[in-house]
């Protein structure tokens, strides 16, 4: 799956799949020690979730870890 990130605000991204927003990626907490979460926007049955989503929400220690999990998506330039 090829994902793309669209920056909304510092620490907040839309996650696109085939041009459609399917999830959000957001930072929780201050920069130092912040965690990141990727959350599907629709409550899909597990069999219908796009890989690598096995749950509706996944937690990560760093932005880089989240990007690795998403297959190193391209970050779209800001409008």
Where are these regions (language model features)?
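Mixed-charge, Lys/Arg-enriched low-complexity segments
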Residues: 1-6, 37-79
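Short N-terminal "domain-start" leader segments
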Residues: 1-44
């Amino acid at each position: 799956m090829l994902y793309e990130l669209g920056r909304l605000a510092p620490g907040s991204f839309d996650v696109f799949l085939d041009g459609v927003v399917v999830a959000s990626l957001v930072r929780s907490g201050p920069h130092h020690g912040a965690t990141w979460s990727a959350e599907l926007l629709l409550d899909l049955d597990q069999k219908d979730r796009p890989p690598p989503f096995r749950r509706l929400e996944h937690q990560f220690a760093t932005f880089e870890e989240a990007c690795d999990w998403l297959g190193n998506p391209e970050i779209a330039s800001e409008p």
